[in-house]
Curated annotation (Swiss-Prot):
It comes from Rhizobium etli (strain ATCC 51251 / DSM 11541 / JCM 21823 / NBRC 15573 / CFN 42). This is tRNA pseudouridine synthase B. One of its GO terms (molecular function) is RNA binding. It holds the Pfam family TruB_C_2. Keywords: Isomerase, tRNA processing. SUPFAM superfamilies: Pseudouridine synthase (SSF55120). The gene is truB.
């Protein structure tokens, strides 16, 4: 019987909060960082369109197991809407599908915003990663197929008009939940105002729980390639990583001993009784000696592991 293949790359674990430049795809960014860090695995926590810039959290190594906890977090975007044209992609890339000479006043824009705050029904753009009958909507759209994408509920926590540089554009900031399409907001604003609209600028500034000052520009990472000594270069890159546990900061935290850590790594539950144990049944994570050991469920006085870390 052949031995299982040893994964290629370094067994590192952590998050790099990339400040993604425009005209650089999210998948391309993940591949670049995986190569730079010589990591075994890499993945991002939410696609950022190539025309968008800003925060793209990228998980390396075992941190990829925590991606779902970041995907579910709140996000903040700054975006510019250009009035007068609706486009196939709802951004600058697409062909113009509708146009209007009408332009909204600043007060008219402010008047519609309250209707987009809270739980709203939103139809994703035709060019989106939504699956229709097993195929991505953007693949069907590129093939010229007009598909009906069902609406879905999304959460908008805050929506602010930051200003209007001129009659043709308006600048906004939105704090929203998982699955919200900012391009769809621009499209819907334009339709309601009777002037049509599309995204002409988009920047993500926050993905919970990571703050804007954690972002590292791609140019800073590329500059480290000039360090000839590989060990020195990797050490400089590793210094930019955020601890894997940061992605789990919204969950209850258990500090355990070495014996308990061993039990969890073997897939066995541990007792969590005592004054510091969480009372309510919930998901939680456990660390020993500052290292992440497992994510699991607390219930009936036990912590049962779901995901175990090396």
């Amino acid at each position: 019987m052949s031995k299982p293949r040893k994964p290629k790359g370094r067994p590192i674990s952590g998050w790099l909060i990339l400040d993604k430049p425009m005209d650089f795809g999210s998948t391309e960014a993940v591949s670049k960082l995986k190569w730079l860090y010589k990591a075994q695995k890499a993945g991002h926590a939410g696609t950022l369109d190539p025309l968008a810039s800003g925060m793209l959290p990228i998980a390396l190594g075992d941190a990829t197991k925590t991606v779902p906890y970041v995907m579910d977090g709140r996000k903040i975007y700054e975006f510019t809407v250009s009035w007068g044209e609706e486009r196939a992609t709802d951004d600058l890339e697409g062909d113009v599908t509708q146009s209007s000479e009408r332009r909204p006043t600043e007060q008219q824009i402010r008047d519609i915003l309250p209707r987009y705050i809270g739980t709203i029904s939103q139809v994703p753009p035709q060019f989106s990663a939504i699956k229709i009958a097993g195929e991505r909507a953007y693949d069907l759209a590129r093939d010229g197929e007009a598909v009906e994408i069902p609406s879905r509920e999304v959460e908008i926590f805050r929506l602010t008009l930051l200003g209007c540089r001129d009659a043709n554009t308006a600048h906004f900031e939105v704090e929203c939940g998982k699955g919200t399409y900012v391009r769809a907001l621009a499209r819907d604003f334009g339709r309601e105002l009777g002037c049509y609209g599309h995204i002409s600028g988009l920047r993500r500034t926050f993905v919970a729980p990571f703050s804007e000052d954690a972002m590292v520009p791609l140019a800073n990472l590329v500059a480290l390639e000039a360090i000839e000594d590989m060990d020195e270069r990797l050490a400089a890159l590793d210094a930019l990583l955020i601890d894997t546990c940061e992605a789990l900061s919204a969950l209850p935290h258990l500090v355990i001993n070495d014996d308990q850590a061993h039990r969890l790594k073997m897939g066995n539950p541990i007792l969590v009784r005592g004054r510091d144990a969480p009372i309510a049944e919930s998901e939680a994570y456990a660390t020993a000696r500052g290292r992440l050991i497992a994510i699991g469920e607390i219930g009936q006085g036990e912590f049962r592991p779901k995901r175990v870390f090396a």
